[in-house]
Design a protein with these regions (language model features):
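FIC/Doc superfamily catalytic core
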Residues: 1-307
Length: 307
């Protein structure tokens, strides 16, 4: 019997040593992702639709695209907050600052937190300032971008240091909920993030699949004490930024942030074994399809578009 280790086995070896994900990122699971005709077909449709959106964007012009994206984000706020935000298509940074400076209001705090995340994605993608981490410490830099404008309760919390305590995901507040998932042990975080970087650079997987699987793996690792959701979604948006464009990326942020319960349900199906990576990718790519449909609606305001 041959004892030669294949390239595929070598790429998967690290993942199979990761507690909590060894059942997900197996050689067989990654092979199924590569060979899934339904995923390949769905991605081909996504890219074709994106090309049509790009054609409309070019006719619309960058400033008008900025204006339309900002208006889309403003409309996510409640009416009182929306009236306080001015559209500044020439200055995405000023727009983000205005969203972050909305005065504290406990009744709209959760909605504002979600809209701040979308506004951050908009500002970074509009400025071409969002890229994938190049090393493990790059995840800390990504955290800083993902948490820009979020309240800091003290000098120590929240911050971009990797957590040094055990963490779990629960289905309700502490002492009232059930444990859904035990996150990676603190001692494993550096090694597992390095393995995540390997996944994100695996050219045998389509970029969209790398982006979505990278998000799932990041959620399993949960390397920070706070802001993991913001950072994980930002990571996925960064990975998609090489193939998709501002309106789609902003609308995808809306889909995954405003409808994050749906994404969470997909993660739970992975946890329980009721779904596999193919199912997870298909579900998240369906959200990307929805984002493209919303982007098309936004761009129609500047002219007619057919998809």
């Amino acid at each position: 019997m041959s004892t030669e280790v294949t390239m595929e086995e070598r790429k998967c070896a690290g993942f199979e040593n990761v507690p909590g994900v060894r059942k997900l990122f197996t050689a067989e699971a990654l092979t199924q992702l590569r060979r899934d005709p339904a995923l390949s077909e769905r991605i081909a449709v996504l890219r074709d639709r994106e090309a049509k959106l790009v054609f409309q964007m070019e006719k619309t012009g960058p400033l008008e695209v900025n204006r339309l994206c900002q208006e889309h984000i403003i409309q996510l706020l409640d009416e009182e907050d929306a009236a306080k935000i001015a559209v500044t298509p020439e200055d995405p940074g000023a727009f983000l600052q205005a969203v972050c400076l909305l005065s504290l209001n406990p009744f709209t705090a959760q909605l504002r937190r979600r809209v701040r995340e979308i506004a951050r994605v908009y500002r970074l993608q509009a400025k071409n300032a969002l890229s994938l981490p190049q090393d493990v410490n790059g995840f800390r830099q990504l955290w800083e971008l993902a948490m820009e404008g979020e309240p800091r309760w003290s000098e120590d919390f929240p911050n971009s240091a990797f957590r040094d305590v055990r963490a779990v995901i629960m289905d309700a507040p502490l002492l009232k909920g059930n444990v859904l998932r035990v996150c990676s042990a603190p001692k494993n975080i550096h090694a597992e993030l390095a393995q995540l970087l390997d996944l994100l650079s695996d050219n045998t997987l389509m970029p969209e699949i790398r982006a979505v699987c990278g998000f799932a793996l990041f959620e399993w690792i949960h390397p920070f004490t706070d802001g993991n959701g913001h950072t994980g979604r930002m990571l996925m948006n960064a990975a998609l930024g090489r193939l998709y464009h501002l309106p789609t990326l902003v609308c995808f942020s809306s889909e995954t942030v405003m409808g994050k319960g749906r994404t969470g349900n997909l993660l739970d199906l992975l946890r329980t074994g009721e779904g596999n990576l193919n199912d997870f990718c298909s579900g998240v790519l369906a959200q990307l399809e929805g984002a493209q449909a919303e982007a098309a609606k936004i761009l129609r305001k500047a002219g007619r578009i057919t998809l």
